[in-house]
Amino acid sequence: MAEKRNIFLVGPMGAGKSTIGRQLAQQLNMEFYDSDQEIEKRTGADVGWVFDVEGEDGFRDREEKVINELTEKQGIVLATGGGSVKSRETRNRLSARGVVVYLETTIEKQLARTQRDKKRPLLQVEAPPREVLEALANERNPLYEEIADVTIRTDDQSAKVVANQIIHMLESN
């Protein structure tokens, strides 16, 4: 890649956005940001606490502001929160300010990757995790597809392999 375009990773929880994003940024010598971690830095609290205190709407407002600021930077890799695409403004900014890579994964892989993670507020509910993930997929997958420049399935692949696939696809476009 001659010029350093921003690379924005979207997809459901458990798709590997943060892990793959760090790997990708390292391989491309770019700065890496994770929108959830940025929110935690700015609030001094974890995402679960923000959800509990401010509700999902309050969290999404913070997320939209953070993503707006980060996408104004140049030459970054950004792992977005799974629900960030619910905001039309965020979708528009991601599309306009960089290359959007949709990291796709199955519900089974999401369950396996998130089952012991207590930092997933949307899974800390009474409903069975599979039902929650299926409902989120029905709502969000069309939004990921709407803005994706590239789609890559992450099931059964290491972060390094997926990062290499992304680099190859970006270089061939």
UniProtKB/Swiss-Prot annotation:
Residues spanning the signal sequence: none
One biological process term in Gene Ontology: chorismate biosynthetic process
Sequence positions that bind substrate: D36, R60, G82, R140
Molecular-function GO terms, alphabetical: ATP binding; magnesium ion binding; shikimate kinase activity
Source organism superkingdom: Bacteria
Cofactor: record remark: Binds 1 Mg(2+) ion per subunit.
Pathway assigned in UniProt: Metabolic intermediate biosynthesis; chorismate biosynthesis; chorismate from D-erythrose 4-phosphate and phosphoenolpyruvate: step 5/7
Keyword Electron transport: no
Keywords: Amino-acid biosynthesis, Aromatic amino acid biosynthesis, ATP-binding, Cytoplasm, Kinase, Magnesium, Metal-binding, Nucleotide-binding, Transferase
CC terms in the record's Gene Ontology section: cytosol
Main location: cytoplasm
Cofactor: Mg(2+)
Catalytic activity: shikimate + ATP = 3-phosphoshikimate + ADP + H(+)
Function, as annotated: Catalyzes the specific phosphorylation of the 3-hydroxyl group of shikimic acid using ATP as a cosubstrate.
Homology family: Belongs to the shikimate kinase family.
Subunit structure comment from the entry: Monomer.
Name listed for the protein in its UniProt record: Shikimate kinase 1
